């Protein structure tokens, strides 16, 4: 049985946004019997913690999945997931700044959905944008596979980094 961990999301049951809905679809909709999922969730977002949801194991990290703590949240989740996974699906790039170090001690298969072009969003200041661009670059460089959720992101990855991204458009119900 293949063991797949999913990190970078607030968690499931979905109560936040798009990545959480995607995870709901991955673990629940036509989920192959030969894949066992573990989803890493923010303990701060789930006061009532389930250990299993839709046949996926849930593991809780005592940090916020959003804001400045998201970087550490993603790194801690990645380290914990390494022990129990064959493949790690990383949703978003904030913790990918750690991948150069991670690759020194692990060759686990990493599939990364880079999401949007976070470094271009107006809500971020200049230092946050630079950090997000660096993390995105590390995500693409160290990923075994990059996922784009739309053609624009797929084209961007090809033009910016010379790497092909797999296109899996949202809703995720066809994953």
Language-model segments: residues:
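N-terminal strand-loop element at the rim of the active site
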Residues: 2, 9-15, 28-66, 152-160
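Short amphipathic alpha-helix
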Residues: 18-30, 77
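A short, charged, and often flexible helix/loop element on the N-terminal side
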Residues: 53-79, 122-128
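A short, histidine- and acid-enriched strand-loop-helix "catalytic/donor-clamping" loop
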Residues: 66-68, 97, 111-128, 142-145, ...
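An aromatic- and histidine-rich active-site surface loop
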Residues: 69-82, 86-115
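Membrane-proximal helix-turn-helix segments that form the acceptor-binding/catalytic region
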Residues: 79-82, 104, 128-146
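Donor nucleotide-sugar binding/catalytic pocket of nucleotide-sugar-dependent glycosyltransferases
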Residues: 109-112, 137-175
């Amino acid at each position: 049985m293949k063991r797949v961990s999913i990190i970078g999301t607030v968690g499931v049951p979905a109560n936040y946004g798009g990545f959480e809905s995607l995870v709901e679809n991955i673990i629940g909709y036509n989920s192959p019997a030969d894949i066992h999922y573990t989803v890493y969730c923010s303990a701060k977002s789930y006061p009532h913690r389930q250990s299993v949801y839709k046949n996926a194991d849930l593991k809780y990290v005592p940090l916020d999945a959003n804001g400045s703590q998201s970087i550490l949240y993603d790194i801690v989740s990645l380290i914990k997931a390494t022990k129990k996974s064959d493949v790690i699906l990383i949703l978003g790039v904030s913790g990918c700044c750690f991948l150069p170090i991670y690759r020194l001690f692990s060759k686990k298969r990493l599939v990364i959905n880079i999401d949007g072009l976070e470094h271009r969003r107006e809500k971020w200041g200049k230092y946050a944008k630079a950090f997000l661009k660096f993390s995105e670059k590390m995500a693409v460089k160290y990923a075994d596979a990059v996922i784009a959720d739309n053609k624009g992101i797929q084209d961007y990855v090809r033009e910016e980094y010379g790497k092909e991204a797999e296109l899996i458009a949202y809703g995720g119900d066809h994953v």
